[in-house]
């Protein structure tokens, strides 16, 4: 057990006074080369380390390492900012005073529909049926009249009578048409009530050719041969095109990325200067750069690269330029890229963006649309200071879009700083946790030191040997490396990805995994959010995540396309996860998952939970038979014990009676022998021997 114990405890050598002097750390070369000491954890804000000393230790080591890098670089160029660590930099940006600036107006509304009611907020839940409104035009009937015969008056009278009859028929037809129109109006009202949910007058884009969408979006969907939009996209596109701020939540793989990328097309085209022809000279005017119009903030580098790859088709079709910047690679290359491309859409992680703003390479004063992808992660405590600095660089009337798979109620107050009324809250599915019914989920309660063997046994099952893509998630890099060595010794080929490795290698590993050149990947939460790989069949939580929201993000990586049949998720839980057992089991029940009875029994025994479960008929019969046998055995044992007790009592009573009678006789014989001093010695020895037999009584 000692070898599995975490070596980072309160007695760690970094807490010794000889290693800490004047808030500085003195480390040997071997300690600096040891990655396991320098990099403790890669999960969300080091939540896995509960003791404050460990946070201080990590901070001291990082500062020392940072000083060494600055000395090597020479101090002219600042060190790179890792966007995943909020404590990696100390930059304070001055917010722009937009009140003193005459801000140019911009078009927000691109929805081809009636205006929205003036109320504080809207909330869309669930789905509606597809309805198409058809406007029928009234056709006028024309009749040809014969030429009048002046000499034949009778014919004229007959014609007049025929005309009167025709007029009567026309009147009857008109009445029938009016009745049909009234019926159609009633039908249209019913359709409008269903097409515009909750009386909000925001339609649903059932197809890419819906009337509510602008022509630029229709052209985009036509050229890309876009299939039927997902349920989330049907609601999200019209909602964003209204120009209002929006919070959107839906399960992983529901098309949230394209849900906010598509409305950017009309938003940018309305402000991009295309350099049209001069009316007088007929010459083409040079294009003028309008600045960054849309900013997309993402929590991880991998998600930023994925979003950027989805914007390339927009650049090809409409000439809207996009760029992505993130930490982990050279800033000079990104600066050259920004100066060359001059993007209208910028995708970035918070840390690198703040550094670029401070150095004067990025100006956000022209941004009119702000997107927070994975908003629940972005609005967590560690990143809020960075986001507030970025928000101070953007005009206050910008349209803000917050999308995520989960958005707990605890973040509603925080989101008020980013959402202006009237706002729209779009929710498809559960209020906090998405539905993952399409994924078969199972769990096992196990001791921590038994998890490695259990993982190897699990990976040796047929479903994992078929070379189906599998991701194994860890909370700590140290544990990931240890398990990786064990798997290599067991001849199980795999790749590993975590925060320590270079960005180029991380990109290569993701491309290798997505192209099926490798099928087993060990990872931290670095790819637990937003990364879209179509054909992932299995998810294994070697370390159970520290929240159910993160569990949904991890498990949601599987089964994101029709190619994947029967995706599965398996989780190991230990005693340290006891605080999540009850909500996790309730979540599985809400998902209609078959929870194993041994798992529930162990939870009841170890954690004192009171989970109820029903056994199958076969198991019930077996248990009933066992109970009957046990009852019979207990009855036989009880009877046997009673008989033994009775026999013991009888034996003891008989012996006591014999002893008492013998004792009386012996006393009488002794009294008679007192007068007779010359008694036989043989008789005395016999009486002594008899007395010895009854001494035990």
From Swiss-Prot:
CDD domains per UniProt: DEADc, SF2_C_DEAD
Binding site for ATP: 226-228, 233, 250-257
Cellular compartments annotated: Cytoplasm; Nucleus
GO BP annotations, alphabetical order: nuclear-transcribed mRNA catabolic process, nonsense-mediated decay; rRNA processing
Helicase ATP-binding domain segment(s): 237-425
Sample GO molecular function, one term: RNA helicase activity
Biased composition (Basic and acidic residues): 152-190
Motif Q motif: positions: 189-234
UniProt KW Cytoplasm keyword: yes
Database matches in Gene3D superfamilies: P-loop containing nucleotide triphosphate hydrolases
Superkingdom of the source species: Eukaryota
Motif (DEAD box): 373-376
Function summary: Probable ATP-dependent RNA helicase.
Name used for this protein in its record: Probable ATP-dependent RNA helicase ddx5
Gene: ddx5
